[in-house]
């Protein structure tokens, strides 16, 4: 584990734009149960691809007109209980950090793994996210056709 003082700026990059920090398993479960619409779950990390790609991509994507109903973050390697619980919702995917999952009614509908993040630029991650926002977070997201 890293000293918390080192993590504050990494946490604040996301909380500053309105992403809620969840540090316990109960807080993660409460967010999943308490969200109508799409919940974006960000697994934050100290690694370079989180710092140089994922967090900047998320910040830029949050300028998009369509966004998740709610967004939360856990910090891998620091908030173990919360991270494990969040990953428990990422059915069918191995643990990876950083990563971003999209849940509707507690079910995973879209996943962006570390392998998707580390091979892209922040601009490309922004594009991935805005596409996911449009597909899973818009007014017609989840509508049966």
UniProtKB/Swiss-Prot annotation:
Coiled coil: none
InterPro entries: BrxB/BrxA
Gene3D superfamilies reported in the protein's UniProt record: Glutaredoxin (3.40.30.10)
Gene Ontology BP terms: cell redox homeostasis
Signal peptide (UniProt feature, chain positions): none
PANTHER family (alphabetical): BACILLIREDOXIN BRXA, UPF0403 PROTEIN YQIW-RELATED
Family designation: Belongs to the bacilliredoxin family.
Name of protein: Bacilliredoxin Acid345_1880
């Amino acid at each position: 584990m890293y000293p918390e003082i080192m993590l504050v700026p990494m946490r604040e990059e996301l909380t500053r734009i309105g992403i809620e920090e969840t540090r316990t398993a109960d807080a993660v479960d409460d967010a999943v149960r308490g969200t109508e619409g799409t919940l974006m779950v960000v697994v934050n990390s100290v690694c370079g691809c989180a710092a140089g790609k994922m967090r900047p991509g998320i910040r830029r994507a949050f300028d998009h007109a369509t966004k998740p109903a709610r967004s939360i973050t856990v910090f891998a390697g620091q908030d173990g209980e919360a991270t494990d619980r969040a990953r428990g919702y990422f059915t069918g995917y191995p643990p990876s950090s950083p990563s971003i999952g999209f849940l509707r009614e507690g079910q995973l509908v879209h996943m962006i793994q570390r392998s998707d993040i580390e091979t892209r630029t922040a601009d490309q991650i922004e594009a991935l996210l805005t596409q996911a926002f449009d597909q899973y977070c818009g007014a017609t997201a989840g509508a049966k056709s």
